[in-house]
Amino acid sequence: VRKLNVQRGMNTSQRALTWIPTYARKIKNIADEGFFKNSIEYSDTARKNGEYMQSVCRSVMNVFHFDDYKRGAKEICDYLEDNSNIEEFNTVHEYFQRIEAACKDTCKDILVKKDIPVWLTVFSKFVKSGLQDSKFADFIHELSGKLRSKDVNGVSYDSLNKESGTTDKKLVVAKINTYTALMNEFLHIDTTETSSTEVENDNTEENEQENPEETTLSFVQENANPDATEEDIEFYRDMVE
């Protein structure tokens, strides 16, 4: 597939999927289902560019392999090909279906594309509470209103949402922990008898490598294209290589 598509100029997300042949069909099936069509602001361009399929891969990475967190699209797919299994993809598939059934099309202002892997991780923690999925939708609705500016350890949904990065591990950790804390408080989920709900940002070497990437994105946004994304940066890097 990679050889046949050399002249088509596949983007980063599309090329990355060629590194995960075992689960590629499953990933495509999930990305083509109702959550991406109904529960977020659907974009045909994003679908054609493989961005929804990449969101599925990042969700599996976040939910099941966060200790080995990878940032790049190719690195994620390469890792999952060797370390994931069909049960993990089936579980994430179920989570997408349950969120869609609970939220329908009423939470699009919160369930934005850049945060899909974060919300799948938060939902995986919600599932452990045993509450009905409608309660998760109640929380998302509340986050659209009063909770969006509520402070948690110096940050809020609004402040995190303004950050330009989407895959920086420090930012992903902050979002998961902040949104989970807001959810637990709003739904009165008792976590005292369970292990900590917080994920940790313990990969120092990777974190140090992430900062230059964030600077690159910020530089491009400030000096060339204010709408540039991290996927654009990855695509340009691939072209140079």
PLM feature segments, named:
Residues 1-83, 87-90, 134, 164-200, ...:
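Basic- and aromatic-enriched surface patches that contact anionic nucleotides/nucleic acids
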Residues 63-67, 84, 96-103, 107, ...:
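Alpha-helix capping/termination and helix-coil
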Residues 75-89, 96, 109-115, 119:
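Small-residue-rich helix-loop
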Residues 77, 93-100, 137-144:
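Hydrophobic core segments within long, regular secondary-structure runs in both alpha-
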Residues 104-111, 166-167:
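Short, contiguous acidic/charged loop-to-helix segments that flank catalytic cores in large enzymes
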Residues 112-164, 178-181:
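C-terminal hydrophobic structural anchor segments
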Residues 152-208, 213-219, 223-240:
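Acidic, carboxylate-rich catalytic segments that either coordinate divalent cations
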